[in-house]
Amino acid sequence: MNRQELITEALKARDMAYAPYSKFQVGAALLTKDGKVYRGCNIENAAYSMCNCAERTALFKAVSEGDTEFQMLAVAADTPGPVSPCGACRQVISELCTKDVIVVLTNLQGQIKEMTVEELLPGAFSSEDLHDERKL
C-alpha cells in the first residue's frame, strides 16, 4: 500500500468519527509491516478528558489484535495545514512505533507533511527513562 492509499483509508476513518461536541473529525490509518491496515477515528465524550483521538484508536486496535510492527501512520483532518497530533498521541506513537516509522499528516485540501516518529517527538520520554539507575 502506498502513501496515497493509506491517506484514503485515514479519510474513510474520519467519516466514522464521533465528534458531536467539537465537530472536529479526525481519521487515522495504520499500516503494519505485513500489510494490514487498522483505521481509527476520534471518539468524543461529554466529559472531554474521556475522549480518544484517532491515532490512539488505530494503534490500540492494532496492538489489541497482536500487531506491533508498523511501517506507516496517516492522519487526516479538516485543518488549515496538515493536521498536528496532540501531545498525548505523540507520546503513544513514540511508545508503540519504532523511531523510523513514517508519519503522514494531511488535511482535506491534500496538503501533506511527512516525517518519522523520531522527528514527530524528538527526545521522547521512553521506557529507558523509567529504568535509569538513580541515586536517591
Swiss-Prot record:
Entry's EC annotation: 3.5.4.5
Keywords (A to Z) from UniProt: Hydrolase, Metal-binding, Zinc
Chain sites annotated for binding substrate: N42, I43, E44
NCBIfam families linked: cyt_deam_tetra (TIGR01354), PRK05578.1 (NF004064), PRK12411.1 (NF009076)
Annotated Gene Ontology cellular component terms: cytosol
Lineage: Bacteria, Bacillati, Bacillota, Bacilli, Bacillales
Catalytic activity: cytidine + H2O + H(+) = uridine + NH4(+); 2'-deoxycytidine + H2O + H(+) = 2'-deoxyuridine + NH4(+)
Protein name listed in UniProt: Cytidine deaminase
Species whose genome carries this gene: Bacillus subtilis (strain 168)
SUPFAM superfamilies reported in the protein's UniProt record: Cytidine deaminase-like (SSF53927)
Catalytic site: E55
Keyword Zinc recorded: yes
Function of the protein: This enzyme scavenges exogenous and endogenous cytidine and 2'-deoxycytidine for UMP synthesis.
Domain CMP/dCMP-type deaminase stretches: 1-128
Stored Pfam families: dCMP_cyt_deam_1 (PF00383)
Example GO biological process: cytidine deamination
Cofactor: Zn(2+)
Cofactor: binding comment: Binds 1 zinc ion per subunit.
Phenotypic consequence of C53H: Loss of activity. Reduces activity 500-fold, without effect on zinc binding
Subunit structure: Homotetramer.
Alphabetized GO MF terms: cytidine deaminase activity; identical protein binding; zinc ion binding
PROSITE patterns: CYT_DCMP_DEAMINASES_1 (PS00903), CYT_DCMP_DEAMINASES_2 (PS51747)
Similarity annotation: Belongs to the cytidine and deoxycytidylate deaminase family.
Residues where Zn(2+) binds: C53, C86, C89
